[in-house]
Curated annotation (Swiss-Prot):
Top-level enzyme category: hydrolase
SUPFAM superfamilies referenced in this protein's UniProt entry, alphabetically: Metallo-hydrolase/oxidoreductase
Positions in coiled-coil regions: none
Protein name, as recorded: Hydroxyacylglutathione hydrolase
Binding-site list for Zn(2+) 2: 59-60, 129, 167
UniProt organism field: Halorhodospira halophila (strain DSM 244 / SL1)
Length: 255
């Protein structure tokens, strides 16, 4: 049976390690720290098969060169971003296969960075810094419109998709979400569960897309309550869903 595990790294990053059904090989997603990956491979007696990168930020690529050199494995990453270690550049809409793991689907997710991509594999969405549990990434290189479109693209995936994001930001994300959407009972329950998990030293990820659609404000920009909250915050009418998104993102950036 295939599986994907989040490895805590750096300040609040997650490196995702996925193993094949035979339990002999694994691939790494966004390895910001090679030592964390090496320790996990040693503990589980697994061989590294590939590295997948979602975007160029150093906390997601810091360990790639060391892993690629030591293990001589392919490195997949966004074709439109400059990541020197990527030797298999890919873009959204492409599919590729890895022996023992089957097929991967690549999705374009511009917004956080201009060339950000995500990977869909066996019901797992490796979303990097595009979609978080309870939130989304800051808009650094793209536009709010691009980011909103990217998230809507991800929101159309099957509801049982496991969202494997790049950071442990869930409690802060859900605290903001609860501020913007205080009458959402499911959101309040999820926030408490996330607090309990962190207090116990447990990760809050992966989530499911169904959870995100019910509680993540950045996927719910057509919700009347969130529209009103965003309008109250900015002091003007918001006619389009992407305007609601942009306002929520600016609001979150100030908290």
């Amino acid at each position: 049976m295939t599986s994907a595990d989040p490895l805590a790294a750096l300040a609040d990053n997650y490196i995702w390690m996925a193993r094949d059904a035979s339990g002999t090989t694994a691939f790494a997603v966004d390895p910001g720290d090679a030592a964390v990956v090496e320790a996990w491979l040693h503990d589980h007696q697994l061989r590294l098969a590939a590295v997948l990168v979602t975007h160029h930020h150093g906390d997601h690529t810091g360990g790639v060169a060391e892993l690629a050199e030591r293990h001589r494995v392919p490195v997949f990453g966004p074709a439109t971003e400059t990541i020197p270690t990527v030797d298999h550049p890919i873009t959204g809409g492409e599919h590729f296969s890895l022996e023992g793991f089957g097929e991967f689907r690549v999705l374009d997710c511009p917004g956080h960075t201009a060339g950000h991509i995500a990977y869909l594999w066996e019901g797992h969405l490796f979303s990097g810094d595009a979609l978080f549990a309870g939130g989304c990434g800051r808009v650094f290189e793209g536009t709010a419109g691009q980011m909103h479109a990217s998230l809507q693209h991800l929101a159309a995936l099957p509801a049982d998709t496991r969202v494997c994001c790049g950071h442990e930001y869930t409690v802060k994300n859900l605290e903001f979400a609860h501020c913007a959407d205080p009458k959402n009972d499911r959101l309040a329950q999820r926030l408490q569960a996330a607090r309990d998990a962190r207090a116990a030293g447990q990760p809050t990820v992966p989530s499911t897309l169904a959870e995100e659609l019910a509680t993540n404000p950045f996927l719910r920009t057509d919700c009347p309550e969130l529209r009103r909250a965003a309008q109250d915050w900015c002091g003007r009418d918001l006619d389009q869903a992407y305007e609601v998104f942009a306002t929520l993102r600016r609001w979150k950036d100030t908290t």
